[in-house]
Amino acid sequence: MGSLQAMRRAQRAQGPATIMAVGTSNPPNLYEQTSYPDFYFRVTNSDHKHALKNKFRVICEKTKVKRRYLHLTEEILKQRPKLCSYMEPSFDDRQDIVVEEIPKLAKEAAEKAIKEWGRPKSEITHLVFCSISGIDMPGADYRLATLLGLPLSVNRLMLYSQACHMGAQMLRIAKDLAENNRGARVLAVSCEITVLSFRGPDAGDFEALACQAGFGDGAAAVVVGADPLPGVERPIYEIAAAMQETVPESERAVGGHLREIGWTFHFFNQLPKLIAENIEGSLARAFKPLGISEWNDVFWVAHPGNWGIMDAIETKLGLEQGKLATARHVFSEYGNMQSATVYFVMDEVRKRSAAEGRATTGEGLEWGVLFGFGPGLTIETVVLRSVPLP
């Protein structure tokens, strides 16, 4: 009889988990930030609130977001007017939309990732899906697996309501699955649609106005696996390490509550400072085995959050100008797409590296960090190793 140790060795991959493909998608409806206040106050029947509209216009300008993609259109909102109210119970209307639309948008991103990966989708062994919205049974993971035609034997995991750090969290889980199940190929998908948080304006709720000004809709997918097949699978990054930390006594720093009116969000006005003051400890612990302590020596795949958070991180860590340029670019072109955003940044980093003739997928550097932060306050840190570019 074989030993348990031999059985366990046979189940584990030989090499580290790698990211083999990335795909992204957005709804077709593009909204320019300069004209969004007019749209928002018109569809919510709030054009008579002149002072509040001017305030919202200033908020939109300060985000430094240029444009966003959103599922909601004026036609949809006319059909479901409760969504335009500030406090009217409207959860059922919102839920009817997201349960159907989240898997559809996710499918677009997943198909792009699978196409780049280059192997049949029947070879996908695990599906990890995350979203802040669309809680249902069976969940969005089941619906996506059905839409894609994945094998009935695919191992599914659904993650709900984790918010902005969930993209990095999902990568940590995918790493463990790939390295502990030999031959596993993990399709990890994130999809965020802001239908549950869209609502009319109120003069006394700055946080709600900030959400209307900064959040966007998008989906992203990656294929993760270890021991890539030579000549078939072409890794983009190796996942060297992944960890999570919770900042003590920070529960009220940022969070959300699911109510009859949809999602309501709150955030501490010193959130940028809180993140900046705690990120270096996470970085130090993650990179200690590599002997790296100079943060300009690594490439950055960062969840942007907002402009103020990126400014605070740059200042605290002494980052060179341009270290977070890709995160800033993605934020300005798409807004904050919560868990999906960090994958848009990853996709942009590897594409820019190739376009600029860099030596590696990490802007010419070997080691990099992917990080996200969210309610808790939770910080996810992932150590990436780039691969050489031809």
Swiss-Prot record:
InterPro entries xrefs: Chalcone/stilbene_synt_C, Chalcone/stilbene_synt_N, Polyketide_synthase_type-III, Thiolase-like
Disulfide pairings: none
Keyword terms: Acyltransferase, Flavonoid biosynthesis, Transferase
Temperature section of the record: Optimum temperature is 45-55 degrees Celsius.
EC code: 2.3.1.217, 2.3.1.219
Description of pH dependence: Optimum pH is 8.0.
Function: Catalyzes the synthesis of curcumin by condensing feruloyl-CoA with a diketide-CoA in the curcuminoid biosynthesis. Also acts as a demethoxycurcumin synthase by accepting 4-coumaroyl-CoA as a starter substrate instead of feruloyl-CoA.
Protein name: Curcumin synthase 3
Phylogenetic lineage: Eukaryota, Viridiplantae, Streptophyta, Embryophyta, Tracheophyta
Annotated gene: CURS3
